[in-house]
Regions:
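Non-catalytic alpha/beta scaffold blocks inside enzyme catalytic domains
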Residues: 1-23, 30, 34-191
Length: 191
């Protein structure tokens, strides 16, 4: 399948970038599942690199109402706290300043802040076409929210498991699969 070959080649290119860059920052979306966040965090730990959840653009004061009771437009921000992923501006600024490679995982912050990525290599993982892909050195398409399963923490702190019943023949890989493939390559030291 041509799509699988292209994705495999893209993952190989990402592996090469991960093994040749020392100062790496993963920037995660607060819409990822706990499993996706944990897998990225495990890979980052193996590589001894940094992970940030900074995403101030996902807050909207006009979004809250009597039912939602929050201005946070994300599905899983509480997972950052549970997994001890720093989402502060100070941490993000410090780590981004040092980074030579930035890996953006479904985080839309750079859509209007592309200038922050100048002189850096960029790898992006997105389920949809966006401006960030346009200035990425490597862009990996991943399954959308409706095509994947995972665990999310709701506004009341209750964990909810989401199970996808979408087309299982879809060639799009989940973020978890991409990250696990990369981790396996790194452990083996080869593509």
């Amino acid at each position: 399948n041509k799509n699988e070959t292209n994705v495999d080649n893209t993952i190989t290119n990402m592996f090469k970038e991960l093994t040749t860059n020392k100062n790496i920052l993963f920037v995660l979306s607060a819409n990822l599942s706990i499993e996706e966040m944990q897998n990225v965090k495990n890979l980052a730990s193996k590589l001894n690199v940094d992970v940030s959840g900074y995403s101030p653009n996902t807050f909207d004061e006009s979004f809250a109402d009597d039912y939602l009771r929050t201005n946070d437009r994300t599905a899983n921000r509480a997972a950052f706290k549970e997994l001890q992923i720093d989402e502060s501006k100070e941490y993000f600024d410090e780590k981004l300043n040092k980074a030579s490679l930035v890996i953006i995982v479904e985080n839309s912050y750079f859509e209007n802040n592309a200038n922050l990525l100048e002189n850096k290599k960029v790898i992006s993982l997105f389920s949809h076409h966006c401006m960030t892909i346009g200035y990425s050195n490597v862009a990996i398409p991943v399954a959308s929210f409706y095509e994947k399963s995972g665990t999310y923490i709701n506004i009341n702190g209750i964990k909810q498991k989401v199970i996808s019943k979408m087309n299982k023949n879809n060639p799009m890989q989940s973020i978890t699969t991409v990250i696990e493939d990369l981790k396996s390559m790194i452990e083996k030291g080869t593509v």
